[in-house]
Amino acid sequence: ESLNSYEKSYFLSKVKVEEQLLVNDININLGSGGRYFPLDDYVTKISRHYKYIILETEIENTPWTNWCNNLSDKFLFLLNPTEGIQNNQIIDVMDQIQEETPEHLLVDKELIVCHENKDHFPIKTSEYMAALQPISNHYHINVNDKNDFSRLARIITNKSIGVAFGGGGARGLAHVGAYKALLDNGIPIDVVCGTSAGSMMAGIIASGFSIDKIKS
């Protein structure tokens, strides 16, 4: 839903494919060869009308999962931090695809850590990234916050909004007003950084403090 706000997108899961192609188990149709021409034709037709196709793999390393992996130009790992990384088999397959791909055609691998809430500071992120290396980027989202999904959608569609705050000692307090002006005009901030006093403001914003909290 959030992705469709920025670019026409289509979500495709194994269940949806089986419903559309009237098959009981697409894994059987794909078989060990990993090809099923009605599926290829179906996805080709979809791609004519949508900018992005989101493919949902299975947790196991199945023919459907392999088909998705071979077709994808970006891997998005959704991780529940309370469970950690459990699908090592799929990761191994993706690593093999990367090894067999010319460097200039390598697929981006990005980690999305899905929190029930973000009241607590994230932990073990570096461990997750090390297990999935090479990772081009990682994001923390609150699955109950639509704004976080909108931020992720902007990032995926290359429409993210970044702000860099400059230094200036006490004058850096003016950044609070600049931040409030952005919010008042409905301009979200997806990426934030700064130098000197600006870095302090960037850290406060990245921590999710409201304007009222900042002022107090």
What are the residue ranges of the model-derived segments?
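Short internal beta-strands
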Residues: 12, 110-114, 191-193
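Conserved catalytic-core segment of NTP-binding enzymes
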Residues: 36, 42-43, 48-137
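A short, charged/proline- and glycine-enriched loop
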Residues: 107-108, 156-161
